[in-house]
Amino acid sequence: TAVEEGMEVTTDSDRLQKYRKMILELLFAERNHICSVCVSNGHCELQMLAQTLGITHVHFPYRYPKMEVDASHERFVIDHNRCILCTRCVRVCDEIEGAHTWDLMGRGIDAKVITDLNEPWGLSETCTSCGKCVHVCPTGALFEKGRSVAEMLKRRQFLPYLTLMREENE
């Protein structure tokens, strides 16, 4: 359906809420999201959305993939078990920092964010160690070594700018 002036669009219905819950449950089941042991527990957008939607358990079988944790960077860690592939890190690194260190690799369940053509993050020649990627991560996938997300003051002022840039490029 093409967008028209005066069009009425429903963004909140029982059917849409059901779909939102299902998508969120699939995100939880796809990777190893165990909130009680996560560095982002209590400060995670995925967890907050699940609470808002009233999700108390997942109706899909968990996959429990063996995803790697890259702690090779001197300041930061990426835990692929917690990544939801939102690509905020990719976009902030490219559009705000201008480094384009992050990218996506693989398809489907094998997809993951990578640095410099799948080099360990600590060996990246393009990473400026600015930490912008860590600050925009909605889960505990990117975090500072030795700190929980609760200890970090997340600076997310980049998010409205990313939306604006995307709209200008379209």
Label every PLM stretch briefly.
Residues T1-T126, H135, G140-E170:
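Fe-S ferredoxin-like electron-transfer domains
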